């Protein structure tokens, strides 16, 4: 994924936004290859959660095609322009307010994707069988176990080292190798972070339970099977969209932004302002490569 966005948002994304994030920030050192495989990756990601049947698979693939076509045409040019702006920002010192504004732009783009993609997810929710809902719940449990392993198991120092390793990987992809002083700065920021993994895990479980309950409610309110070509009921679609949007990370620029959101912006700005001219040029080169890839993708069909 675009490493800068991962650093800025940090823990701002919830598991419920994985689909949107994959599309919104799709990218790596081979961004074009990754984006061109997005159809397959998204399909298998959803299938892993729901164990789809043949008819569900056919309709989902069709919906993904439409979503990606819209995304390529309507969203990628805006992302490329945003990367150009980030290249300019990378050459100068940043304030936490600037970083929060950029994170808020990512949040807005995610919201647009949800508005476009909620109908296919609603259609799928209406067709899930009891066995598929059980499969979904087991997958959620497995996902939570992975979160526990990463963020809650082991001593406090071991947990910190795991977080530090992941964070440094993201920073060094953008800036190149960090100095010892910069590594110490990142460590200090993580130690002071208000991020509470136990609370986050509890919130994840609440969201997952809410999703399962919503699926049950939607199916109970659907008197007959939905035809493949039939639009989803508006009320059902709005209910799913509401669930998705409640999972968005809080607006970093809002007056009620949680402390951990503000801390993430401050931590990024602090590290960036410690970088050397060479490190900033490295960041600009990385962002230029992403921008070039996105502009090339907009011309592909």
Per-region residue spans from a language model:
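A cross-kingdom marker for long, charged
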Residues: 43-44, 201-301
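Short, structured motif recognition centered on aromatic/hydrophobic residues
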Residues: 46, 60, 117-128, 136, ...
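Acidic/His-rich structured neighborhood in mature extracellular/periplasmic domains
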Residues: 100-184, 190-191
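Helix-loop elements that line ligand-binding/catalytic pockets
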Residues: 175-204, 208-212
């Amino acid at each position: 994924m675009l490493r800068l966005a991962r650093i800025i948002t940090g823990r701002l994304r919830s598991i419920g936004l994985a689909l949107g994030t994959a599309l919104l920030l799709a990218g790596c050192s081979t961004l074009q290859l990754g984006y061109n495989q997005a159809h397959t990756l998204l399909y298998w990601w959803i299938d892993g959660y729901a164990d789809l049947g043949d008819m569900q698979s056919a309709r989902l693939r069709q919906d993904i095609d439409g979503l990606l076509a819209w995304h390529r045409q309507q969203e990628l040019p805006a992302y490329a322009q945003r990367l150009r702006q980030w290249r300019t920002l990378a050459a100068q010192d940043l304030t936490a307010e600037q970083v929060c504004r950029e994170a808020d732009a990512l949040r807005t783009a995610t919201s647009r994707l949800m508005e476009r993609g909620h109908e296919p997810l609603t259609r799928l929710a209406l067709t899930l069988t009891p066995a598929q809902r059980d499969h979904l719940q087991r997958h959620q449990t497995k996902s939570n176990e992975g979160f526990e392993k990463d963020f809650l198991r082991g001593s406090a120092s071991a947990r910190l080292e795991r977080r530090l390793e992941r964070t440094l990987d993201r920073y060094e992809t953008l800036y190149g190798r960090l100095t010892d002083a910069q590594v110490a700065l990142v460590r200090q920021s993580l130690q002071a972070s208000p991020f509470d993994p136990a609370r986050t895990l509890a919130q994840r479980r609440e969201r997952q339970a809410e999703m399962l309950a919503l699926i049950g409610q939607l199916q109970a309110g659907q008197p007959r099977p939905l035809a493949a070509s039939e639009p989803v009921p508006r009320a059902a679609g709005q209910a799913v969209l509401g669930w998705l949007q409640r999972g968005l990370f809080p607006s970093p620029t809002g007056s009620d932004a949680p402390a951990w959101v503000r801390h993430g912006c401050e931590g990024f700005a602090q590290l960036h302002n410690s970088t050397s001219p060479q490190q900033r040029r490295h960041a600009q080169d990385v962002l230029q490569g992403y921008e070039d890839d996105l502009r090339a993708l907009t011309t592909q069909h």
